[in-house]
Amino acid sequence: SVNVYMLPFIRPSDVRRRFPDDDTESFDSAFKAAVSHLNVNENERNIILAHQFITGAAAGGSESVSVGGLDNISAEVFEPFDYAALGHIHHRQNITSEKVRYCGTPLKYSFSEVNDKKTVTIANIGKKGELSIEEVPLCPIRDLREIKGTYLEITDRNFYDKFNREDYIHVTLTDEN
């Protein structure tokens, strides 16, 4: 069997209301307190789904992050788990190893993500401690595209023949006329 735990985005005030005797002054301490109350059996296979900003993650620009990293939590809190499937960051990435991973979003939400290749992450959990990750590429019906050109170029219908006309575009004019 595999135990699956889910924690939403947690603020210190959320944990303080539920566990008033725990240290919950920071996001990190609040998340650690919440995990400690899950009673994880480390001899079994454990997966956690969480929506937090982990120290060391690279934000892509379209996510909301706090000034100074106040809402960061340490990746060490995931040590009792065989896999941590994380949300909050739009770009797929491993944090300390493939066992602590942001899968990224399936769609691009901002032009800061225009060059991202979106995927679905498949995590295969074998025996205790065995993990393999597979990424399946996604091909959106409509993509985000950045184009540059003069006013005359971008207003010429033929300019768009080389693109999917259904894509969402961000246009940069290279002239002032």
Give names to the regions the model predicted.
Residues 1-177:
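Extended recognition/assembly regions associated with phosphoester-bond processing machinery
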